């Protein structure tokens, strides 16, 4: 049994972590740290200890792992002001780049802990499982990169693609976080659809950096906001090196992900649906070939708050501690 802390427990991701970890059979005690608890009654449980962030200094040595559910730049600031725990899983982008200069270029923040970057593993289990198993520090991937990389990985692994990948990705408004903005308020998002951060979204460099570790591919990434609360749907278009059929591509994806509990591969004629992954740690994928252009057309659907954030973080925790990977994560979708 382990004791787990969550710093930043009152945001959307922190709340999802709390919900999942509260029912996790190997979590003995859950420590929630936040300066913004408004409805503390929802955390009433013998298994939960609730406090503001100031008590972290007294308690961190008692914790086996800490989740940082903070915004980019905030985890760095918190760790500069407090002790580094024995193990952590960071939900921000603060440790996703090995090169501190690249992080500064993308986020406009000078990295204050460059010596720690080489010790942090990028937490995409289906690709980097063995590294995660031996890691003490995990950088949880972004939601868009999770969907995009899971869609591209089988092609890159088998050297079937080259050139430029086009990723056309739609997200629900929870991806913007709990703090309201002009784009996320109901009056502006309802019955609306728009692209944002066009050609300069911060997740594009993250995707490209990890793609370089897998192989090599350039990425054109355009995110869009759709009027749903949770979910990501990524449409990926990428040229193929050789002529293969949709059925052959389907079998290739099935083979690559045959042992992956959370990856569901649909037949070529089917499309994933956001509604059928809500509340799950699944990534549902379909892949087919456009014969006219010899491009692979890949669709990926995930819940941005679960597989794109909290669920994947708990999946990483399970790997770190040698638990069954699906422990505490075996959810059916919130459907209908």
Curated annotation (Swiss-Prot):
Stretch forming the signal peptide: none
Pfam families per the UniProt record, alphabetical: Semialdhyde_dh, Semialdhyde_dhC_1
Catalysed reaction equations from the record: N-acetyl-L-glutamate 5-semialdehyde + phosphate + NADP(+) = N-acetyl-L-glutamyl 5-phosphate + NADPH + H(+)
E.C. code: 1.2.1.38
Keyword Ribonucleoprotein set for record: no
GO terms for biological process, alphabetical: L-arginine biosynthetic process
UniProt pathway: Amino-acid biosynthesis; L-arginine biosynthesis; N(2)-acetyl-L-ornithine from L-glutamate: step 3/4
Biological function: Catalyzes the NADPH-dependent reduction of N-acetyl-5-glutamyl phosphate to yield N-acetyl-L-glutamate 5-semialdehyde.
Gene Ontology cellular component list: cytoplasm
Keyword terms of this UniProt record: Amino-acid biosynthesis, Arginine biosynthesis, Cytoplasm, NADP, Oxidoreductase
Subcellular localization(s) per the UniProt record: Cytoplasm
SMART domains (alphabetical): Semialdhyde_dh
Organism: Dictyoglomus thermophilum (strain ATCC 35947 / DSM 3960 / H-6-12)
InterPro entries membership: AGPR_AS, AGPR_type-1, NAD(P)-bd_dom_sf, NAGSA_dehydrogenase, Semialdehyde_DH_NAD-bd
Keyword Transcription regulation in record: no
Active site, renumbered: 143
GO molecular function terms attached to this record: N-acetyl-gamma-glutamyl-phosphate reductase activity; NAD binding; NADP+ binding
Protein name stated in the entry: N-acetyl-gamma-glutamyl-phosphate reductase
Cross-referenced NCBIfam families: argC
Family as reported in the entry's similarity comment: Belongs to the NAGSA dehydrogenase family. Type 1 subfamily.
Enzyme class: oxidoreductase
């Amino acid at each position: 049994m382990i004791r787990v802390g969550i710093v930043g427990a009152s945001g959307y991701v922190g709340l999802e972590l709390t919900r999942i970890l509260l029912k996790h059979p190997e979590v003995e005690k859950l420590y929630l740290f936040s300066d913004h608890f408004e409805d503390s009654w929802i955390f009433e449980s013998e298994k939960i200890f609730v406090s503001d962030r100031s008590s972290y200094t007294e308690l961190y040595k008692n914790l086996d792992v800490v989740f940082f559910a903070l915004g980019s730049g905030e985890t760095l600031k918190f760790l500069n002001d407090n002790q580094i725990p024995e193990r952590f899983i960071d939900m921000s982008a603060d440790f996703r780049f090995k090169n501190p200069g690249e992080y500064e270029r993308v986020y406009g923040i000078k990295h204050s802990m460059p010596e720690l970057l080489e010790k942090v593993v990028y937490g995409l289990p289906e690709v980097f499982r063995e590294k995660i198993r031996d890691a003490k520090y995990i950088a949880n991937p972004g939601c868009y990169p999770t969907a995009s990389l899971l869609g591209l990985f089988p092609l890159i692994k088998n050297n079937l693609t080259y050139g430029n990948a086009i990723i056309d990705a739609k997200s629900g408004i929870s991806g913007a976080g709990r703090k309201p903005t002009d784009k996320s308020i109901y009056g502006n998002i309802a019955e609306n659809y728009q692209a944002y951060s066009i050609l300069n979204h911060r997740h594009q460099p993250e995707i490209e950096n990890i793609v370089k570790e897998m192989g090599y591919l350039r990425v054109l990434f355009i995110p869009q906001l759709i009027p749903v609360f949770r979910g990501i749907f990524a449409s990926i278009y990428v040229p193929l090196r050789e002529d293969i059929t949709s059925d052959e591509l389907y079998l290739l994806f099935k083979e690559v992900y045959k042992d992956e509990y959370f990856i569901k591969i649909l037949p070529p004629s089917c499309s994933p649906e956001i509604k059928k992954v809500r509340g799950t740690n699944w990534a549902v994928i379909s892949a087919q070939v456009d014969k006219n252009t010899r491009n692979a057309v890949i669709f990926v659907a995930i819940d941005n708050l679960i597989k794109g954030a909290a669920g994947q973080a708990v999946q990483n925790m399970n790997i770190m501690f040698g638990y069954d990977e699906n422990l505490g994560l075996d959810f059916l979708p919130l459907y209908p």
